[in-house]
């Protein structure tokens, strides 16, 4: 890596963040594209966010990636939000346009870009998402923005169930796309929705231990279903193994991780990240 007086910086900001794979991905991308940049990981306290944002301008940085717990808090420092970031209510990428800071959310678009190798396009398709956390909302919002026909969200009944239902109703009203919430434990209803589904996504952390399972194993998957697990630290979760045994195409979360990074990289540099080469390196790293 060449570092000189012309080198520009980007960084990921979160707490904690020292475990992040983002520096590996982006610094490799800078090298492979001959872009004179460097990417760092900054673990900062909330009270330092304002100073960090100002340094993006002062140091003419490309921008920032934002991870937990600051994806919502960073919004107040933005000059403008992309449609996806505004709809999701979270920013994971800050882009510096000559001192004007624009907040984007690349999680959803990165996810769907990672499915292009399956010739999958979300337009006019039905999607079933397991979970209602931040990752799920990003996928749901992007699916709606990209013209999905119907989105079904399955979550367990808990204190967050009714607030999630309200949030999904607002997303539906803003996008005009039908978005329904159903109980994850309701096997009959899930089977009915699965029969009409083109894409099934596990957006929960269930399965990260390599043993737990997010839904009823008695459910039957329709033909030609694409099944994705957002988890990438376990190469094939029990969920993906179950889907593969039923003949489904399967994809783990590594594509989503690299996909959102590729979208950020493009917004900063105008260059396409060499995703295939980086995926090969990441498969050795993870």
Swiss-Prot record:
**Which Pfam families has this protein been placed in?**
SDH_C, Shikimate_dh_N
**Binding annotation for shikimate:** 20-22, 67, 92, 107, 232
List this protein's GO terms for biological process.
amino acid biosynthetic process; aromatic amino acid family biosynthetic process; chorismate biosynthetic process; shikimate metabolic process
Enzyme class, broadest EC rank: oxidoreductase
Which InterPro entries did the record assign? Aminoacid_DH-like_N_sf, NAD(P)-bd_dom_sf, SDH_C, Shikimate_DH, Shikimate_DH-bd_N, Shikimate_DH_fam
Pathway it works in: Metabolic intermediate biosynthesis; chorismate biosynthesis; chorismate from D-erythrose 4-phosphate and phosphoenolpyruvate: step 4/7
**What does the function comment of this entry state?**
Involved in the biosynthesis of the chorismate, which leads to the biosynthesis of aromatic amino acids. Catalyzes the reversible NADPH linked reduction of 3-dehydroshikimate (DHSA) to yield shikimate (SA).
Report the family membership: Belongs to the shikimate dehydrogenase family.
Subunit structure comment from the entry = Homodimer.
What protein name is recorded for this chain?
A: Shikimate dehydrogenase (NADP(+))
Which organism was this protein described from? Answer: Lactococcus lactis subsp. cremoris (strain MG1363)
Lineage at the top is:
Bacteria, Bacillati, Bacillota, Bacilli, Lactobacillales
């Amino acid at each position: 890596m060449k570092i000189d007086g012309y080198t520009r910086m980007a960084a990921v900001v979160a707490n904690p963040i020292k475990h992040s794979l983002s520096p590996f991905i982006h610094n490799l991308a800078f090298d492979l594209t001959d872009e004179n940049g460097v990417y760092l990981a900054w673990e900062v306290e909330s009270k330092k966010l304002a100073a960090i944002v100002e340094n993006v301008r002062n140091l003419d940085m490309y921008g920032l990636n934002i991870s937990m717990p600051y994806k919502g808090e960073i919004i107040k420092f933005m000059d403008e939000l992309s449609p996806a970031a505004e709809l999701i209510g979270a920013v994971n990428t800050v882009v510096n346009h000559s001192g004007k800071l624009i907040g984007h959310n690349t999680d959803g678009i990165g996810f769907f870009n990672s499915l292009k190798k399956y010739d999958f396009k979300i337009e006019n398709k039905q999607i079933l998402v397991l979970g209602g956390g931040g990752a799920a909302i990003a996928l749901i919002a992007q699916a709606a923005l990209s013209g999905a026909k119907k989105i079904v969200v399955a979550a367990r009944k808990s204190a967050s169930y009714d607030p999630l239902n309200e949030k999904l109703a607002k997303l539906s009203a803003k996008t005009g796309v039908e978005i329904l919430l159903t109980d994850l434990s309701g096997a009959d209803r899930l089977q009915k929705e699965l029969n009409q589904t083109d894409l099934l996504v596990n957006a929960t952390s269930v399965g990260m231990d390599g043993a737990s399972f997010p839904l009823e194993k008695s459910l039957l998957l329709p033909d030609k279903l694409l099944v994705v697990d957002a988890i990438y630290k376990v190469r094939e979760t029990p969920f993906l193994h179950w889907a593969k045994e039923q003949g489904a195409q399967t994809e783990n979360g590594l594509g989503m991780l690299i996909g959102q990074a590729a979208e950020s990289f493009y917004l900063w540099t105008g260059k396409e990240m060499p995703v295939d080469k980086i995926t090969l390196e990441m498969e050795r790293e993870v």
